[in-house]
């Protein structure tokens, strides 16, 4: 395994609890596209605590942001969606339909995980 991959895996493992907590919080409070204010705040706060420089309100979109860390190479870009969909409210860990709020918002495509 090369050194970059080892470093990436070490960093992911070191922050796994943070990533899981963010994912769970976003699952628990699903917000529709362009209205993910709580989720965006969770992400930007976490990035800032990890030493990233965060730009908020990208392109006039209140929930869009970017985080930069370090300089030089490699340059890595990641797009993470974190919006919910209407009508997909679901209890965590349930294999069959068990809505938290019937007809409410929920994460059916893993967007709570993609952003984290």
Indicate residue ranges for each PLM-predicted region.
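Acidic/His- and Gly-rich active-site-bordering loop/insert found
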Residues: 2-107, 112
């Amino acid at each position: 395994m090369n050194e970059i991959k080892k470093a990436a895996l070490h960093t992911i493992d070191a922050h796994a609890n943070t990533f899981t907590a963010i994912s769970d919080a976003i699952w628990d409070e699903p917000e529709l596209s362009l209205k993910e204010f709580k989720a965006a705040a969770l992400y930007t706060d976490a990035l800032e605590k990890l030493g990233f420089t965060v730009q908020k309100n990208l392109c006039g979109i209140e929930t869009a942001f970017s985080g930069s860390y370090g300089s030089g190479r490699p340059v890595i870009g990641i797009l993470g969606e974190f919006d919910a969909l209407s009508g997909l409210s679901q209890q965590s860990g349930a294999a069959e339909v068990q809505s938290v709020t019937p007809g409410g918002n929920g994460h059916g495509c893993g967007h709570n995980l993609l952003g984290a």
